[in-house]
Amino acid sequence: MAISFDKAFGIHQYALSVRSKRAEVLSSNIANADTPGFKARDINFSQALEEAQHQQGFGLATTSEKHFALQSDAPGLTQYRNPLQPDTGDGNTVDVQQERSEFLRNSLEYQTSLEFMNSKISGLLKALKGEQ
């Protein structure tokens, strides 16, 4: 009997990749907080998760990895954020407090998905070894 990793891991395998990409975008925002004209960006998580599932052929069997074009970047899913602070005069829309808060939240959610996947892998290993 074959093990279906899509069923075992659910959406958490896709959530990890989306949260990783979001961490890159948020850290770029923080790094460019003092760059004149820089516009803060973010990723719509639910839309990106749906796209990641689609790109990975969620639930579909493939005979060749050439059948699906996998992309590590998320073009079209990265959106400019509407600034919540007044214009500082340099055109930069990064609110460092908001970016740090979003980065922390994203990190906690990444860690939660990672812990869930670790517990699933541990369960699969126990099943393969015949342990309880």
From Swiss-Prot:
Coiled-coil ranges per the record? none
Q: Which GO terms describe its cellular component?
A: bacterial-type flagellum basal body, rod
Q: Which Pfam families match?
A: Flg_bb_rod (PF00460)
InterPro entries given in the database record? Flag_bb_rod_N (IPR001444), Flagellar_basal_body_rod_CS (IPR019776), FlgB (IPR006300)
Disulphide-bonded residues: none
Just give the chief location class: other
* Top-level division of the source organism's lineage: Bacteria
One GO biological process this protein is involved in is: bacterial-type flagellum-dependent swarming motility
Provide the protein's localization.
Answer: Bacterial flagellum basal body
Q: Which UniProt keywords apply?
A: Bacterial flagellum
Enumerate the PROSITE patterns for this protein: FLAGELLA_BB_ROD
Oligomeric and partner information: The basal body constitutes a major portion of the flagellar organelle and consists of a number of rings mounted on a central rod. In Gram-negative bacteria, at least four rings, L, P, S and M are present, whereas Gram-positive bacteria lack the L and P rings. The rod consists of about 26 subunits of FlgG in the distal portion, and FlgB, FlgC and FlgF build up the proximal portion of the rod with about 6 subunits each.
Biological role stated in the UniProt entry: Structural component of flagellum, the bacterial motility apparatus. Part of the rod structure of flagellar basal body.
Which family, according to UniProt? Belongs to the flagella basal body rod proteins family.
Write down the PANTHER family for this protein, in alphabetical order.
Answer: FLAGELLAR BASAL BODY ROD PROTEIN FLGB, FLAGELLAR PROTEIN
* Protein name stated in the entry: Flagellar basal body rod protein FlgB
Q: Which organism is it from?
A: Aeromonas hydrophila
